Amino acid sequence: MKKTGGFTLIELLIVMAILGMLAALVGPALFGNLSKGQRSAAQTQISNFESALDTYRLDVGQYPKTLNGLVENDSGRDSWDGPYIRGDLPKDPWGNDYFYQPNDKDFVLMSYGKDGKPGGQEDDEDIGR
């Protein structure tokens, strides 16, 4: 009887075990970088919103009541010179709306992180000002 080339079941199990151990070691590092990238993207979007909001305030004299005021003239003022953001309002990297609350002289603008709720730690930590 002629022996054909191939792997035995034991050899395949050993290779699969080694691949599993490598995945267990490398996987968390890859997902950690993904999380850092999402947080960085949220910070960049918030900076873009801040610039657009400040430009809106220079034109209109106050901050918009909602972020939608950056893409549509919801102020009713002729001095509105938008849209101040191209296209639709972006969502945060986790698909949630940004939290925006204007007051007389400033505003609060935040991403609530992965869970979309105030507070939290690590991936769920709030990002913004």
Model-identified regions with their sequence ranges:
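N-terminal single-pass transmembrane signal-anchor helix
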Residues: 2-30
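Short, surface-exposed interaction loops/tails
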Residues: 36-40, 47, 51-54, 76-78, ...
